[in-house]
Amino acid sequence: MSVGLLLITHNNIATSLLETARQMLDTCPLATRALEVPLDFPVADVMAQAKEHISTLDTGNGVLILTDIYGATPANIGKQLCNDFNCTLVAGINLPMLVRILNYPQLNMTNMALKAVSGGHDGILLCECQETEK
């Protein structure tokens, strides 16, 4: 058994990130679900879908929830789920974070959450660009 993974984001971010990570790794070693929150969709309906996903994903080791922006609706839904289920929430999802998690499917939920944060942080770089000669 491993930790389940639920991505809750605005619009098509979760699906796009998950599909890209799967293509890059040629596999997806964790049970995952993507849930998008349209701007005009009733929160109660999204919450019901999220609870169904949690019930499917949690095989006894909990569910790591990744959201896009802390304080926005997807993260608020995630926070509520953490109050009701065995979940951990990490906000600020990016592709390096997701790839890092999928490379360590054997971790417990606490260590996976820490790996998510380090992967997301390490994947953000200020790149120096040199002018090219004309």
Predicted feature residues:
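N-terminal loops that bind phosphate or other acidic moieties
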Residues: S2-L64, I69-K134
